[in-house]
């Protein structure tokens, strides 16, 4: 859905909820747990329930598939004319702290030239600069995440002093309570409008904003004219959608949160939230570089307790650690908050001191509304010498700038206005006040019309061919005496623009509702792609003779007429209820013909200062951006300088050059490189130490192809640095060591330090744990064993009665929070992964010790004969033993980290292919052995990352430059090199974000198998299939089909049997993930395969475009077309309802779509003609879209699911042949064998 920076609306066509049923919402483990089962106003609840687990498994990288970010265009802001007055700059002239300013503008905008069209305004309150760069999201490294329990109320933490009088007076006066009338944002057709470059500082008659509080950080923000980035959308399909208490799209304000986790990143927070959304989820996260919206703000989230959830938008501030990053994060939050307030017709009004308003902190909700006991974000803001009052002042200023009430930063303002001889020109058009409201209707554009309007302020509309078609209407706008409708595609939500009221035939519409009803319908009746469709929107006609069965699944009322959506004889569409009479029966849905995307052939070029590495798979080098094809290049996986970027149509290019010389390499497509921002190099004079063996590179951020040498000698060597450059967030230095010169990451340079022994006992004993009485929730690092006899576990310290805690007894858990309540002290226990809170225990029920900080180590030990075994957790009990002492005695233990527990030290590592903790007292360090390292050798294979708790490394066996694999867990890793160091095999390859790294072989797997319970027995599902009206088919005699019996079906559906067969197992291969095979290899597969020969590019495009495994597409096409030789694949035409094979224009169908058994050639060609598949490549790409939308992306993402649909047996099944999945599985397995690969992801249903 296009977001608020284009057309924001309350989820058009998706369902306006009737009433405001009281719902309860899940909250943190530290708060009272609510029951969700009574919620009745959830959208598509049955669909969400069915697809949640599948979607959840696929969403691991939080921003991997962002469908574009949008730029907001505000029609209400018009450049005013001003008199020739004395002017000043609108930046607030107050003292600013002398902090270092980050040179990156971190904006996602590029300049365009000679822009005479209405200009889109950025979400930032300042004019955008040209040549700005974006931090590469692929290098956002995810660290371990903390639990979601936030700060809780400390009565001493937040003083209840009255708000300063001036602050209170102005804010309340300037921001009365929101009314229903608003001035929301009205926007462009494009999902990414381009801001124009600013040649000169404009003048304005608007006054300068007068800050109400002193704030050096806010002054820094104003002085440096900080811009907010574009909002990224990272929505998750399985999050529930509930209306606010006043309805969809009607929040009452916004709540400020912080994540309460100093170690996490924005990606880590989002990933954790997606995996634990049942406890809490919020609308957005903000840090110093990005704003990521994770849930539609038209619907509530679970972030502030059961009282506040139905009222407010919840936004989390991710912790940053330096002055500039914190300032950017405050600027980003204020801009996002002001945008939300403006959009929803709300005005800034602080609720902090009276419990009434539109801007809240979590603390204020706890204090005035209840349902939660958190106190954020005050503690975090105070740690940066900032306050909520300063943030609110910035939000208010941003809002007033957006509303055109005060001068934007960077503009000039009138200080001494001259007396005008005639009235000054108003800053708003004279056409009158703008009001915008949500709408839920439909409209047809008349043949004679004024065109489509980008904004309602446009003087003329653009001509359109979209006439006499039914569109959804999502908003109405009134400007002066003129009324407009915002129209969009009914099925996709794509916006067309604003149309005048007089240019359309409009009807009211109720929200669609799900139904399950069968009707009879006369043959020849037309079906439409939309309700109240026109002759231009016919989806097909009912085939057959006499009455046919129409299975309805959806109903919508348009004006006073009822329309139903359903299927009949393989065709789906909408039909008026007037043409239907009650009865029953269903079938699959073809999709409408894809619309032709618009293109923009305007060229924009701007200077750039970055670096890039060309991917191994690329489209080549382009001499000019107008070239249709690029020239092959061997300059891959090397770092080059980037001097320019260009946009032409839908393509973006970088101009790359040799880093050390002026030699230009050529233009490359954006998708063919890994790009990073780069600051200009600066001269330095600094001496460091560097370890021998450290690689030097000829360029900063160099690859293995650009090694300049390695540091020689033994022990630390002296590195004299003469130059420094920042690449993305990393610092690289150029210098000389032992006669060799080159670049090296600063991470490898340090001041000499004495080494520490891995198992050394702490010299100073850790203080024994003593019970304290904190006045609020404190963050602690402790570890506890639950006593066998305990009083139980609580979801909140306020619960009077605890739940039975027997299952936690005699086990060890991490302690992350501590809180006093009355005369008792409670601690929050977390599971062994540190991430998920379990609940609160009274400290009297625990044995507690202090837990030190984990320290990385790399050492091998021998396990003593007498030992306590390998445990799941340090200081684990007998109930948490992974391997007993006898199983690991005198074995080799490979330690990777250590931690102190009280006076003891525990080490974490691997033994007998299992990982866990061992007490240091149970280990003996072996005598030193000279390390062995083999030379890296070429090795090409794609693995799956299986250990999200593992790491990837810049260099193998490094203790410093390593980063968490959590964000890449269960994703492919394309290996190009292999190296063995000290018996450990390492692989060098490419992560899913394009970054090259080293990973241990123990963190990788050749395949990933998941098992899912169906909840039914094999006999039950086989009985359903065998009892269908249209029986499953089997060939007992070649060429002769007969009905399959119960035993045939049961045998074919037995997943235990199939999973044991190395070929038949491939019917469980997940088909919703491409294999990323090169076009050349695909073409080798297709040699001699009829019309499919040399169609590798089409299969590759189809796989990437629709997220489908290309090996499956190929095998499916070969099976359906007889290796590309069938007439259906070779093509024909249907003229006067007869097949013509010698026509000039032929239509092709390579997947047998709609080729029904009674007349497969005619029906298949008719469908291909309707879809416009007049080439084989179009048939491949278009057919893949049908396969993806109707099966693979509908939850049936394996051959087994497509054939048997175990989630809903007997419905929506692709074939009738009981061997269909077996045949395709064998073919797919054969192709994998030919390329020396194996399937990566398997999903196997299990029956009771």
Swiss-Prot record:
GO terms of biological process kind: cell wall organization; peptidoglycan catabolic process
Enzyme class: hydrolase
Known catalytic reactions: Hydrolyzes the link between N-acetylmuramoyl residues and L-amino acid residues in certain cell-wall glycopeptides; an N(4)-(oligosaccharide-(1->3)-[oligosaccharide-(1->6)]-beta-D-Man-(1->4)-beta-D-GlcNAc-(1->4)-alpha-D-GlcNAc)-L-asparaginyl-[protein] + H2O = an oligosaccharide-(1->3)-[oligosaccharide-(1->6)]-beta-D-Man-(1->4)-D-GlcNAc + N(4)-(N-acetyl-beta-D-glucosaminyl)-L-asparaginyl-[protein]
SMART domains linked to this entry: Ami_2 (SM00644), LYZ2 (SM00047)
InterPro entries documented for this protein: Amidase/PGRP_sf (IPR036505), Amidase_domain (IPR002502), GW_dom (IPR025987), GW_dom_sf (IPR038200), MGlyc_endo_b_GlcNAc-like_dom (IPR002901)
Record function comment: Endohydrolysis of the di-N-acetylchitobiosyl unit in high-mannose glycopeptides and glycoproteins containing the -[(Man)5(GlcNAc)2]-Asn structure. One N-acetyl-D-glucosamine residue remains attached to the protein; the rest of the oligosaccharide is released intact. Cleaves the peptidoglycan connecting the daughter cells at the end of the cell division cycle, resulting in the separation of the two newly divided cells. Acts as an autolysin in penicillin-induced lysis.
Subunit structure, as described in the record: Oligomer; forms a ring structure at the cell surface which is important for efficient partitioning of daughter cells after cell division.
Official protein name in the record: Bifunctional autolysin
Source organism per UniProt: Staphylococcus aureus (strain Mu50 / ATCC 700699)
